[in-house]
């Protein structure tokens, strides 16, 4: 909210860092301290009770460091934070991340006042502050983090960024999404938002060339009119998970980050009013849809084709298509006749196309015929084959993934695969899906909603004909 410094790149690519409360014992801050001190980032540990940490000299105070410091990360007990913020401002840092919890969210007057004093410091200085009660920033492009991210397990080349008011939940988002082979560009956790808020970060990510899709976990907003103004200017798709729909949930928010949730109906109206802003129901849905935006071309129309190995699941997809106002594509007769030429006579070749057991013999040819049909704008692939035949016959999936990717690129039509069965079957796809950039999910409703949001975005004035592929 501090309007004096709007370029927040020092949070994501700091030239120099001080960790106040740096630790070499197993407590909060240990993992970050160990990682940053052994990274290429110029990092200085500060701890009044230590002389050496992981072989590095420790400073008693940030002002004992002779070199300039761009970013201060604070991980000390809450009663010490205010003085350390003052010390950091005196040092001339550009940014402060306060990871410590225990402020306004406690409801305790003493800690509410401390947070208010920190907020005043932010307003009256050129220092930008994230937090308190957060885990800060992760930049997957340069591998900078103030959290506990394991870059050895993360997916490289992602273009999805996360803004989360919750700290730990931000890490959980990354961990789950990584297991689904969904890659990220940046994650930002804001906590109690004494200064930097979701609006500041939306503006930053809008300018960020490595971010194509923005996701937000939101509890409450302090600057409503400014948020609306920002929504008008954004040109990238934004997926929002806003909690506090119920009265119980709204009350719980205040004790979590100290935010006021507000009337959920107002939020709902605002989200629906602006193109490119889409509300989701849970984080699984949010990141499943985000990966479709990040990896697939936008559809030119709303006609959806389905290839399935289960007729029943194909029918369920039809229900979702109608419910969301999309259309089941009517295949040209020439397309149907082409598929008849290589398909067993018992297959159902009208959309949804049910290939049944012939899936592995006829899939690629059927896929090509359907995607080349001018009546088809997008394709849902439903895979429902048990583990046993896949494992017994060592059936490869990569030729199908490769063909899906090649045709999607060539014809500029999005494809989503929904996998049904055991975790083994899902992993059978996931271990190859990132290479071919085919979104893999387990919920048909998420896939159809992704097509719906992408179709709406393609019609909006925010679609600048940008290719949103990773």
How would you label these PLM feature ranges?
Residues 1-470:
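Catalytic-core regions of core metabolic enzymes
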């Amino acid at each position: 909210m501090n309007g004096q410094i709007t370029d927040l790149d020092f949070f994501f690519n700091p030239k120099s860092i001080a960790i106040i409360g740096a630790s070499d014992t197993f407590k909060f801050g240990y993992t970050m301290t160990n990682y940053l001190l052994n990274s290429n980032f110029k990092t200085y540990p500060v701890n009044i009770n230590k002389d050496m940490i992981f072989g590095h000299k420790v400073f008693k105070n940030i002002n004992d460091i002779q070199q300039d410091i761009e970013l201060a990360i604070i991980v000390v007990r809450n009663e010490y934070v205010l003085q350390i913020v003052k010390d950091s401002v005196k040092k001339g840092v550009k940014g402060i991340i306060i990871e410590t919890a225990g402020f306004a969210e406690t409801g305790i007057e003493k800690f509410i006042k401390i947070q208010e004093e920190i907020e005043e410091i932010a307003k009256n200085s050129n220092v930008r502050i994230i937090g308190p009660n957060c885990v800060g920033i992760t930049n997957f492009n340069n591998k900078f983090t103030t959290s506990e991210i394991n870059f050895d397990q993360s997916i490289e080349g992602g273009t999805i960024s996360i803004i989360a008011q919750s700290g730990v939940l931000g890490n959980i988002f990354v961990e789950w999404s990584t297991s689904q082979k969904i890659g990220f560009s940046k994650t930002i956790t804001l906590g109690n938002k004494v200064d930097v808020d979701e609006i500041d970060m939306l503006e930053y990510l809008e300018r960020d060339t490595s971010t194509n899709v923005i996701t937000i976990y939101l509890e409450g907003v302090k600057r409503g009119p400014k948020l609306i103004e920002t929504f008008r200017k954004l040109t990238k798709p934004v997926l929002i998970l806003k909690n506090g729909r119920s009265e119980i949930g709204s009350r719980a928010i205040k004790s979590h980050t100290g935010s006021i949730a507000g009337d959920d109906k107002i939020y709902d109206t605002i989200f629906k009013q602006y193109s490119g802003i889409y509300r989701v129901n849970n984080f699984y849905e949010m990141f499943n849809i985000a990966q479709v935006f990040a990896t697939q071309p936008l559809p030119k129309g709303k006609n959806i084709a389905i290839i399935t190995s289960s007729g029943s699941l194909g029918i369920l997809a039809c229900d979702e298509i109608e419910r969301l106002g999309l259309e089941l594509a009517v295949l040209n007769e020439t397309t149907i006749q082409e598929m008849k030429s290589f398909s067993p006579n018992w297959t159902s070749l009208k959309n949804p196309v049910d290939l049944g057991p012939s899936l592995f013999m006829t899939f690629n040819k059927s896929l090509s015929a359907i995607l080349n049909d001018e009546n088809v704008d997008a394709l849902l692939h439903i895979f429902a084959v048990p583990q046993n035949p896949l494992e017994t016959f060592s059936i490869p999936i990569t030729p199908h993934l490769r063909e899906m990717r090649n045709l999607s690129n060539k014809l500029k039509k999005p494809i989503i695969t929904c996998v049904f069965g055991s975790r083994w079957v899902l992993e059978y796809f996931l271990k190859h899906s990132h290479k071919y950039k085919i979104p893999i999910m387990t919920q048909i409703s998420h896939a159809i909603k992704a097509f719906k949001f992408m179709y709406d975005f393609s019609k909006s004035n925010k679609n600048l004909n940008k290719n949103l592929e990773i």
